[in-house]
Amino acid sequence: KITVLGTGTSVGIPALGKLGWGNCDPLNPKNRRQRCSVLIQNENTTILVDAGPDIKNQLIEHNVKKLDAVFITHQHSDHISGLDELRPFYFYNREKIKIYTNAETSEFLLTRFNYLFEKSASSQSYFNPPLELKHIEYFEELNINDINIKSIKQNHGVIDTLGFIFNDKFGYCTDVVDFPDNSFNSLYNLKVLIITGLRENPHSAHAHFDLSFNCCLLYTSPSPRDSG
């Protein structure tokens, strides 16, 4: 089961101030968009990708009672600033929540959210860090219970981000403008692909709509190798 929790921009839709709804129709309820995040679930396992500033309301809305793992695509605020909201999952069963991400993002998280991962002399005596960092490489494969996850490398302008493929069927590629050559083969033959489509016109850090649409057509079709 795939549940899309949010598909909004970094400031959400509507945005504060004069940005407002932008070109979106405020009369269409689907245009009210929270920050990007997705749940992957089956009967035994619940995996969250990204935890932005809307994550508490997103998880409450979908009645999420446990998390087996959290995967973080990159260190931008709209993908990580809700990590503190995950503490109650630890309070319930006293098992640290595993946060999977790359080395660059891990380093950033330890700087910004050190108290969530490491106990310090200044911490309250009763406060135990509820999260545990798990470093993953690009193109690594692992299993969370009965769900298989493969990570791929994506370009997001001045930084690289993680994309994820679940059970060789579902690809989640947010905040990407281009893929390196060795990411392409991993994406073929998907049943479902969710990919950034920020604007109608090209953008330096996000794929625009036509590029995203063509990616979906390409990667949810058989690989050229399979078609001879």
Annotate each PLM feature.
Residues 226-228:
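N-terminal low-complexity segments that are often proline-rich with Ser/Thr-Pro
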Residues 1-173, 181-185:
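Binuclear metal-dependent hydrolase catalytic cores
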